[in-house]
């Protein structure tokens, strides 16, 4: 019968977790710019908040406040409906 060596976690080299993940402070671009309402016709701004695969980037990644994230969602959906912004990444403009 084979005997197994017990794995000792203490002998593993320690990693510096802060150097692996550099987190910069997120801020809301719309708050800084003083935007009151996000317009669906501003396609350049909307494209910054759409991922490579065509999905809307969540607020926890962009740092957008909840009020502006809701406006951003409706603006992107309106722009998609009017064919200003593609639904997915396969439709290139």
From Swiss-Prot:
GO CC term (a single one): cytosolic small ribosomal subunit
Stored InterPro entries: Ribosomal_bS18 (IPR001648), Ribosomal_bS18_CS (IPR018275), Ribosomal_bS18_sf (IPR036870)
One GO-annotated biological process of the protein: translation
Gene3D superfamilies reported in the protein's UniProt record: Ribosomal protein S18 (4.10.640.10)
GO molecular function: small ribosomal subunit rRNA binding; structural constituent of ribosome
Subunit: Part of the 30S ribosomal subunit. Forms a tight heterodimer with protein bS6.
Family per record: Belongs to the bacterial ribosomal protein bS18 family.
Role of this protein: Binds as a heterodimer with protein bS6 to the central domain of the 16S rRNA, where it helps stabilize the platform of the 30S subunit.
Protein name (database record): Small ribosomal subunit protein bS18
Species of origin: Delftia acidovorans (strain DSM 14801 / SPH-1)
Gene coding for it: rpsR
């Amino acid at each position: 019968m084979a005997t197994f060596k017990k794995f000792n976690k203490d002998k593993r080299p320690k990693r510096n977790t802060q150097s692996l993940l550099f987190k910069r402070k997120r801020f809301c671009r719309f708050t800084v710019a003083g935007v009151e309402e996000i317009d669906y016709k501003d396609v350049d701004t909307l494209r910054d908040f759409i991922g490579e695969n065509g999905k809307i980037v969540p607020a926890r990644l962009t740092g957008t406040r909840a009020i502006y994230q809701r406006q951003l969602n409706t603006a992107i959906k309106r722009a998609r409906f009017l064919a200003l912004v593609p639904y997915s990444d396969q439709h290139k403009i």
